[in-house]
Curated annotation (Swiss-Prot):
Deamido-NAD(+) binds at residues 117, 150, 157, 234-235. The gene is nadE. Mg(2+) binds at residues 36, 142. This is NH(3)-dependent NAD(+) synthetase. HAMAP family: NadE_ammonia_dep. It comes from the Bacteria. SUPFAM superfamilies: Adenine nucleotide alpha hydrolases-like. Homodimer. GO terms for molecular function: ATP binding; glutaminase activity; metal ion binding; NAD+ synthase (glutamine-hydrolyzing) activity; NAD+ synthase activity. Keywords: ATP-binding, Ligase, Magnesium, Metal-binding, NAD, Nucleotide-binding. Catalyzes the ATP-dependent amidation of deamido-NAD to form NAD. Uses ammonia as a nitrogen source. The keyword NAD applies. Pathway: Cofactor biosynthesis; NAD(+) biosynthesis; NAD(+) from deamido-NAD(+) (ammonia route): step 1/1. Its EC number is 6.3.1.5.
Length: 250
């Protein structure tokens, strides 16, 4: 990858999407303290358009993640707001508790997905208020495996990193000046305390990147990649719809 040239391409691509496709005034994104949102923040800052950045911690969010998110905004030259989603989360879980499945294996994923969807609500509400578009942070590895929450962090107006392997996101981050603390940390969606992407998926980003490069990976890695890809087709498509009565000849 010609890193500098691709960074320039993405910056211009973002501006083309914002002005020509959407006709909006700026960008809105959530900054988690991770590499993907850090790269998106730096790209958005370099467009010169207004950027609304939100840090949206939950009760399980570590203070170091918040500190890394703040460092990201400082390095990108962006102002941001810290708004806790914990009160919204607690209220919804309390109100829905009578109808939720209490089986332990469902609980962590359910809670994590709710946090992602609450962040989506915050981002799109802010974006609408400022006539801006929401930047998604999914990279090619996450898109392949469906490692994002449907209608949560998977909901966005544009996905500038969707063509980049995880290794390329890090390469772009180093070029753009993402803080070293962000570059050094293990990727995590922050869905629960101690959670990491690779432990949850059972496959490393290095293995997924190798697969995306067309290289041979271990049988175990291939099995996990196919497992996650096959069970997440619905995340990469619009909801299916039936034929109309005329089309169905009914």
């Amino acid at each position: 990858m010609k890193t500098a040239a691709y960074a320039d391409y993405l910056i211009q691509w973002l501006e083309n999407q914002r002005t020509e496709l959407y006709g909006m005034d700026g960008y809105t994104l959530g900054v988690s303290g991770g590499i993907d949102s850090a790269v998106c923040a730096h790209l958005a800052a370099r467009t010169g358009a207004p950027v609304q950045a939100l840090i949206l911690p939950a009760e399980v969010t570590s203070p170091s993640d918040v500190a890394d998110a703040q460092a990201t905004l400082e390095s990108a030259g962006i102002d941001g707001q810290i708004i806790s989603i914990a009160p919204w989360y607690d209220l919804i879980m309390q109100q829905l508790s009578p109808v939720l499945n209490s089986e332990p294996e469902r609980v962590n994923v359910l809670k994590g997905n709710l946090m992602a969807r609450l962040r989506m609500i915050a981002l799109f509400t802010t974006a609408q208020s400022h006539r801006s578009i929401v930047l998604g942070t999914d990279n090619a590895a996450e898109w392949l495996t469906g490692y994002f929450t449907k209608f949560g962090d998977g909901a966005a107006d544009v996905l500038p990193l969707a063509g980049l392997r995880k290794e390329q996101v890090f390469e772009l981050g180093r070029y753009l000046g993402v803080p070293q603390s962000v570059l050094d940390k293990k990727p995590s969606a922050g869905l629960w305390a101690g959670q990491t992407d690779e432990a949850e998926m059972g496959v490393t980003y290095a293995e997924i990147d190798a697969y995306l490069r067309g290289e041979t990976v271990s049988p175990q890695a291939l099995q996990q990649i196919r497992f996650w890809h096959n069970r997440s087709h619905h995340k990469r498509m619009l909801p299916p719809k039936p034929k109309s009565p005329d089309e169905a000849e009914c």
